[in-house]
């Protein structure tokens, strides 16, 4: 199927993250020249610039000269202007020689007016430099401008690979002692250092600026994490509220980028007297692609005064390229943006980027990838103020951390939305099948539900056999036929088309359709027949969030202003509909395939042969896999060096391996049959009870700590502490019959942890003890530097103690780069920061899932416990972290468990495949029968077709029985419809005719004449299923040349008030020795080893039981009988 998107040619549709990434890249490439054109027009004609007319998203970008685009990109990335509230130095790495500085740097850093020149690195005074250089000159040693301690701090920070981790550095000028925050970022020419003055009201931070900054956002982070899932609007409302409380701006907005790059204000907190912008949409040009690139590079962007004249940056003339200020916190706003802010009455702003994973998945692949390259810009949190405003860097850093947490929560919402989409697809499938069980294909437009229920649309149509069926808002019949002809002519090789703009897709008659139809999804079902879905223009979907623009206002539409942007967006989107989402196209494609199959002849014999072959392969493969899994499981349990214990459904121990016996001092013979509760410590009783209860319900808890009592020689060592994973044990019918606890002994780890956190004994002797029982331990001081790394951590990670001590724990030791214990992306880094900061604040974390890649790229899964570390006076001096890593044996046991689960899942998938393969020819049979019903038939022919229809409906009913548990437990919901008993018996007998003829059996019907027309209320198809199963079994176990009789004995009972109930005795008698006794037992008692015939008998017996009836099997001399007793209400009063 083809698809079109704004300003892109028609192309084949694809799905997945690769397709989305390609589409995004295409939009960026196409949008950038439009941005460049707009900027060029603004700079070329400031006073006559008409913003509304300049924005035309649908304009042709190919007309923009490449030189204009190149100049535009260079201008944005290489502009040498900064804001005046701070100053900039650019230095060479290593030597710290100045290669550039802002013109206000000499004055701000107090190096103007001194009597002595500042010596350079080589000991000589530098001349020149020009432009207000004073005593600050190109080539001088920048370290001499600051106090020795500050110079040393800058020198140390310059050695960090990721300077973001150590920003800001608190420094003081050498001459006046004036305090600054120094913010470093690395460029090709060296280092760019921003210096922001520390205000008297600020609380100066230490060298651990990043770590300290997180504390400022602790409350906001806790609130975000406590929000219920499934509500992105609430999440956005909360984050803007928290940012406004943190920063104090007049207006804070959450701004989301849509798939076509345009933006929308989805949440807002503002001063009451300000005009609301909530709900406004803005064209993509409002935030150019180059600016979005800068937002990805510099996640927080502050403009303190858009009206303040910018300051020029001077650089060494010997540099080949202009200094890049892309990462500078002081970079000046571009003229177009400054004008935009001024027009909307905003003087200061703070913009924070919100990024999410490209594919919406929290796991981002292996250790050899660069996770940061797989982020995308979801949107922005934008703050505006009506007067100049400066936010200190530590607080901005806290806001950036809050945005990272916000991004994690958004990822969770995206994953939840993906799950809901999958559920939607699963709900759509029965709808599709139901459509085809009716008048295919006309029923999908003439009945309810119809194709408009499949996807969101304004109208739909079916073109079939040169006839049209219309639903909702559609083009006229003549226009639809013209669209079909255009598709056949220009898209003859495609199975369909989807576009949000017929005009841009090239349809010549798009203008005549008006605004009612802009987008279309067309699916070809035959060579000349189509299904159509139509959507109107987007503008009607957009709601004004605030007061509508008053036409009497003298707002100049030529000025750049949010309302002007919104007006421009309305002009653009009235020619375009909402885009068709992937999940919608999947649903349309599924219906297309099923309909196309309905028009093809189906070879029943080939299908039957394929299905039987597949079933045989499935049976053999299943036996081999389950046998291998069982043998491996038994071997592992017997030889495992981790404790494994099993409990039955009554809570009694029925499994106890050697390791469990070793730890507790109790042999298996001593515990088998005893309640598990008797073997656990008092404080673990409720925990174990809850685990058992949930596991027996099928809910398996993981990583739960319990304590077992010890006996005999082990008793003096105290209780055994275990981390337990509960695994529900199931029979072949997926019934939970017990629980298996796979555990890890953490007794020594718990003892060590208690000693560390309470400062008992010589902790260093314990930490550095090479004893394998000591867990992996690492720690950080109050500044965030790694202060502990024990031998177990060395062995686990491959990194030596001397390689990590003194480095930043988050970012350098655990980071997203290869030269560290690499985490799975930025989200993993953010989560670790939250855990450590919570511990530093006194909030301990237990058993937090934690994974990283060791030095050799091997993934390590562990549970992390973080605890504060205090000195003798109780003052927090750092954090201790303990890792619980599952042993090899436990990992193998869990792997075997996963193998068993995978084998079961494979069986389910294979069964689903078989069901689908049966359904496809079944749909063809149903379609053929419906065609026969529409012809002139005799009464006998009509009865044959009716019997065939009942058999087909019974087959569909059985195929839909995905939940056999409901039948076994007696909770199945029965249908109650009026039916004629004679038609049921005809359908039952027809199912036995082939087998009876093959075996030469005589099939005898012995029922009163009134049975044929007797009308009853009940579940017709279930009764038909029961009787046909018993009849087939009777035929299968009858002797050749014998007979099978089918007798019905009705007995009417009066219940009063004109209500009559008919008691029916169905007796199916057959010659021979009868059905084997083992199968008859299986009909009444469920067991794990039953045959498929036994399972069928058992299910039918359960169905009879659900219908408040009973089944017997009576053996007599030379014959045996199924006797089924069940009652049905009469559908009409007996007149006789």
From Swiss-Prot:
Keywords: Chromophore, Photoreceptor protein, Receptor, Repeat, Sensory transduction, Transcription, Transcription regulation. Residues 11-20 have a biased composition (Low complexity). Residues 1-28 are annotated as: Disordered. InterPro entries: GAF, GAF-like_dom_sf, HATPase_C_sf, His_kinase_dom, HisK_dim/P_dom, PAS, PAS-like_dom_sf, PAS_2. This is Phytochrome. Belongs to the phytochrome family. One of its GO terms (molecular function) is phosphorelay sensor kinase activity. One of its GO terms (biological process) is red, far-red light phototransduction. PROSITE patterns: HIS_KIN, PAS, PHYTOCHROME_1, PHYTOCHROME_2. Contains one covalently linked phytochromobilin chromophore. Residues 231-414 form the GAF domain.
């Amino acid at each position: 199927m083809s698809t079109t998107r704004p300003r892109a040619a028609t192309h084949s549709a694809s799905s997945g993250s690769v397709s989305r990434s390609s589409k995004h890249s295409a939009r960026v490439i196409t949008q950038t020249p439009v941005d460049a054109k707009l900027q060029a027009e603004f700079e070329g004609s400031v006073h006559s610039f008409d913003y509304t007319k300049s924005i035309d998203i649908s304009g042709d970008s190919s007309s923009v000269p490449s030189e204009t685009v190149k100049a535009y990109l260079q201008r944005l990335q290489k502009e040498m202007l900064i804001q005046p509230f701070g100053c900039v130095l650019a230095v060479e790495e290593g030597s710290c020689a100045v290669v550039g500085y802002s013109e206000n740097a000499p004055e701000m850093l107090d190096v103007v007016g001194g009597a002595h020149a500042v010596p350079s690195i080589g000991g000589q005074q530098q001349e020149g430099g020009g432009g207000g250089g004073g005593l600050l000159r190109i080539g001088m040693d920048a370290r001499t401008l600051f106090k020795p301690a500050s110079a040393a701090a800058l020198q140390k920070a310059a050695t960090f690979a990721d300077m973001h981790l150590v920003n800001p550095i608190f420094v003081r000028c050498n001459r006046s002692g004036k305090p600054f925050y120094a913010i470093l970022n690395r460029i090709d020419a060296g280092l760019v250092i921003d210096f922001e003055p520390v205000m008297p009201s600020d609380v100066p931070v230490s060298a651990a600026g990043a770590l300290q900054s997180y504390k400022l956002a602790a409350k906001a982070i806790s609130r975000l994490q406590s929000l219920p899932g499934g509500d992105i609007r609430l999440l956005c409302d909360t984050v803007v509220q928290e940012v406004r409380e943190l920063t104090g701006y007049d207006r804070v907005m959450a701004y989301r980028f849509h798939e076509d790059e345009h933006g929308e204000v989805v949440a807002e907190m503002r001063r009451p007297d300000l005009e609301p912008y909530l709900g406004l949409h803005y064209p993509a040009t409002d935030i150019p692609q180059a600016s979005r690139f800068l937002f990805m590079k510099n996640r927080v962007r502050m403009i303190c005064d858009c009206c303040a004249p910018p300051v020029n940056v001077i650089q060494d003339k010997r540099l080949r390229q202009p200094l890049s200020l892309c990462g500078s916190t002081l970079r000046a706003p571009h003229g177009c943006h400054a004008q935009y802010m001024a027009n909307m009455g905003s003087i200061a702003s703070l913009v924070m980027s919100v990024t999410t994973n490209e594919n919406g998945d929290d796991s981002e692949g292996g250790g050899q990838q660069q996770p940061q390259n797989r982020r995308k810009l979801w949107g922005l949190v934008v703050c505006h103020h009506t007067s100049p405003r400066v936010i200190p860097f530590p607080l901005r850093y806290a806001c950036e951390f809050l945005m990272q947490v916000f991004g994690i929560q958004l990822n969770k919402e995206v994953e939840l939305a993906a799950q809901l989409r999958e559920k939607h697809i699963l709900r759509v499938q029965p709808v599709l099948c139901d459509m085809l069980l009716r008048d295919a294909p006309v029923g999908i437009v003439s009945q309810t539900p119809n194709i408009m229920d499949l996807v969101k649309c304004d109208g739909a149509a079916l073109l079939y056999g040169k006839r049209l069926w219309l639903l909702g808002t559609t083009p006229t019949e003549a226009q639809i036929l013209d669209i079909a002809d255009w598709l056949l002519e220009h898209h003859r090789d495609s199975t369909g088309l989807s576009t949000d703009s017929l005009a841009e897709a090239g349809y010549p008659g798009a203008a005549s359709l008006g605004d009612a139809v802009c987008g279309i999804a067309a699916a070809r079902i035959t060579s000349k027949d189509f299904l159509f879905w139509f959507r109107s223009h987007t503008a009607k979907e957009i709601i004004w969030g605030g007061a509508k623009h008053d036409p009497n206002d003298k707002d100049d539409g030529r000025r750049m202003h949010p309302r002007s942007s919104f007006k421009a967006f309305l002009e653009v989107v009235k020619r375009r509909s909402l885009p068709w989402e992937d999940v919608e196209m999947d649903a349309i494609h599924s219906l297309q395939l099923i309909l196309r199959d309905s028009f093809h002849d189906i070879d029943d014999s080939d299908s039957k042969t394929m299905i039987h072959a597949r079933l045989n392969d499935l049976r053999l493969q299943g036996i081999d896999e389950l046998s291998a899994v069982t043998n491996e499981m038994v071997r592992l349990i017997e030889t495992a060096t981790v404790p494994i214990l099993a409990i039955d459904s009554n809570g009694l121990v029925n499994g106890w391996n050697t390791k469990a016996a070793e730890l507790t001092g109790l042999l298996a013979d001593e515990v088998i049959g005893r309640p598990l509760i008797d073997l656990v410590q008092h404080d673990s009783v409720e925990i174990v009870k809850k685990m058992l209860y949930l596991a027996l319900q099928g809910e398996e808890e993981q990583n739960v700590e319990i304590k077992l009592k010890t006996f005999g020689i082990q008793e003096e060592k105290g209780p055994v502490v275990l981390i337990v994973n509960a695994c529900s044990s199931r029979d072949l019918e997926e019934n939970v019959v017990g629980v298996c606890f796979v555990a890890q002994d953490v007794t020594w780890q718990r003892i060590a942890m208690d000693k560390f956190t309470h400062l008992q004994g010589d902790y260093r002797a314990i930490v550095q003890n090479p004893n394998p029982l000591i867990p992996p331990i690492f720690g950080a001081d109050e500044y965030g530097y790694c202060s502990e790394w024990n031998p177990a951590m060395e062995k686990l990670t491959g990194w030596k103690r001397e390689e990590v001590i003194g480095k930043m724990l988050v970012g350098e030791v655990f980071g997203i780069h290869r030269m560290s214990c690499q985490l799975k992306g930025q989200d993993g880094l953010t989560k670790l920061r939250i855990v450590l900061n919570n511990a530093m604040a006194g909030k301990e974390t237990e058993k937090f899932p934690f994974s990283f890649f060791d030095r050799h790229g091997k993934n390590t899964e562990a549970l992390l416990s973080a605890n504060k570390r205090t000195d003798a006076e109780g003052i927090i001096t750092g954090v201790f972290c303990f890792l619980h890593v599952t042993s090899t044996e436990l990992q193998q046991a869990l792997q075997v468990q996963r193998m068993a689960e995978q084998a079961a899942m494979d069986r389910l998938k294979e069964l689903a495949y078989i069901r689908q393969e049966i359904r496809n020819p079944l749909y063809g049979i149903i379609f053929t029968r419906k065609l026969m019903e529409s012809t002139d038939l005799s009464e006998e022919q009509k009865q044959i077709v009716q019997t065939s229809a009942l058999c087909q409906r019974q087959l569909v009913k059985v195929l839909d029985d995905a939940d056999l548990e409901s039948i076994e437990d007696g909770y199945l919901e029965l249908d109650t419809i009026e039916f004629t008993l004679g038609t049921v018996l005809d359908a039952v007998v027809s199912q036995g005719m082939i087998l009876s003829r093959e075996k030469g059996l005589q099939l005898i019907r012995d029922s009163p004449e009134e049975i044929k027309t007797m009308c009853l209320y009940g579940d017709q198809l279930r009764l038909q299923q029961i009787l046909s199963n018993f009849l087939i079994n009777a035929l299968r176990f009858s002797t050749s040349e014998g007979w099978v009789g089918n007798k019905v004995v009705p007995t009417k009972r009066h219940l009063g008030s004109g209500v009559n109930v008919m008691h029916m005795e169905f007796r199916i008698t057959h010659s021979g020795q009868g059905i084997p006794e083992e199968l008859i037992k299986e009909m009444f008692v469920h067991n794990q080893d039953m045959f498929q015939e036994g399972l069928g008998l058992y299910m039918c017996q359960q169905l009879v039981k659900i219908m408040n009836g009973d089944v017997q099997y009576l053996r007599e001399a030379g014959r045996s009988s199924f006797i089924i007793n069940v009652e049905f209400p009469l559908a009409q009063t007996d007149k006789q």
